[in-house]
Amino acid sequence: MNPTAAQPLPPNPYNAHAWITGDPEIGEGCWIGAFTLIDGQGGLKIGRGCNISCGAQIVSHSTVRRCLTERVLDVVDKRLTEIGDHCFIGTNAVVLMGARIGHHSVIAAGAVVLEKADIPPYSLVAGVPGRVVRSLEADVERWSAEARAAKL
């Protein structure tokens, strides 16, 4: 039996059921759902006001090469992963190491953003592998204008 299996997840200020590793930079006003993995071991920056939905995984390292070479190549690959301000990461979405997601973007539920992907701001990304479906810039502008008008 694994002696650490019965230990609780390391405490974090976001969600008792989220696993946050390494030392990620997480911006002010972020919400992180239960059963998420936030891997800061290879460098991770999450901007202000992001929502990371339940079950999402954001990773900044990989042991693929180490595993496949039977540890002949005994390294853990690490790469900075960046998520811009005010991004929404959907339920069970996966963001792999080295990906850059521009501000005000949505990663749809179940999407997989591949290593080194560069997602422009205001993008809606869906699918496996994740692809930009369309721009959300006009939608965000309209929603903001409607919200401002409703407050008058």
PLM regions and their residue ranges:
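Flexible, glycine/small-residue-enriched loop-and-beta-strand segment within the central core
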Residues: 14-26, 31-100, 116, 123, ...
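C-terminal/domain-terminus segments
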Residues: 101-115, 121-122
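A transmembrane-helix-recognition feature enriched in membrane-embedded lipid enzymes
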Residues: 1-11
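Acidic/histidine-enriched, glycine/proline-rich intrinsically disordered or flexible terminal extensions
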Residues: 139-152
